Amino acid sequence: MVAVLFIVFLVALAIGVPVAFSLGLASVAYMLGAHIQMINFAQYFFKGLDSFTLLCIPGFTFAGNLMNQGGISDKLLDFADALVGHVTGGLAYANVLASMVFAGISGTALSDTVALGGVEIPMMVNQGYDVPFSVAITAASSCLGPIIPPSVPMIMAATMTGLSVSKMFMAGIVPGLLLGLGMCATCYILSVKRHYPKRDKRASLAHVLHATKEAIWALIMVAIILFGIMGGIVTPTEASIICVVYGLFVAVFIYRKMGPKEMYSCLRDTVSSASAIMALVAFANVFAFILTKEHIPSMIADAMLRLTSNKYLILLLINLFLIFVGMFMETIAAILILFPTLLAVATAVGVDPIQFGIIVVMNLVLGLCTPPVGVCLFAATNIGARYGKCTLSDSVKALVPLLIINFGVLFLVTYVPFLTVGVANLVMG
């Protein structure tokens, strides 16, 4: 019956059925064939949703939508440009810096690409950067969204396996910063080599102060999330609710851009995004129940450990496998299906679960800007094509130097535990 489970799942995916419903159809087919009472389907479906931690997903999504409604993308980019726009390749740095701050609000990569890309790409093109490079740095920097907290994929990974969401958030900070610094270094080298422009002089103090004043409301939200969770003052779910109240206050009373029409748009987008994730979680929990019942995770773990018991080689194999999976499968779906199984392998060779969670998230998130199914790359390319010649192959060529740096940081995080779990333990004890 295990063969039926996987055949139905793969066939459903192949004919275009959404991942969540493919998992559900495969689970139903297995249960009917194995004569398992369907009440088990309902029980495990709702058990997957019965989590206080999962409430922070609609919370952070709604808070990000509220802030974005106030035009936060323009304000963040202007703030970043005021700080670094005067150096060679300054606007490329500003692109990365804005994504790092926006990551602390949205928690997703695609929202970063769409919200910031519509502002960043035309601004870079107008200042003399070529379109493919503008697209590449926008797509690559948007991958910081699910790595710098809050992170929806991290919430999923932690919830599925009973790990601490707060600790995983803290473990993602240093890898996110390293990715940002690596991208900035790459931008500098390419900017010097290609003679990309820079602003003639530093922004005036008045301009910097004005840009900071405009962006301060977004920076405060990031501080609420990081320091509230890091200090043990609030849980991630409580932090998300505080951010919703704060975001609503800023959108209505500070930015003054929130009317009934805008509120409806924010609520609609939040419900659409959150419900899709929740459906995936619920169906994946039923699928995971079947895999556990058939001892699939332990069989995979035993097979890999028979191949080699070397921790470093196991991590290398898992990295290569996840990079491949990330090129084809949506991040959250891959985490829900694969993470519990691979975690059993990793812990068997002595890898810390929190460190492994960051490794898995980074691998799959980097797939968002790699072909053939890199949604962030597609979105950024579509935006860039409005402002000049830019095909998908052009974007991929421009992306290669950034991907080399990103994968370099990934392997550094894989083999230096202090960068993840070490920092988390220092901060949270």
Regions inferred by a protein language model and the residue ranges of each:
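Alpha-helical transmembrane segments of multi-pass membrane transport proteins
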Residues: 1-429
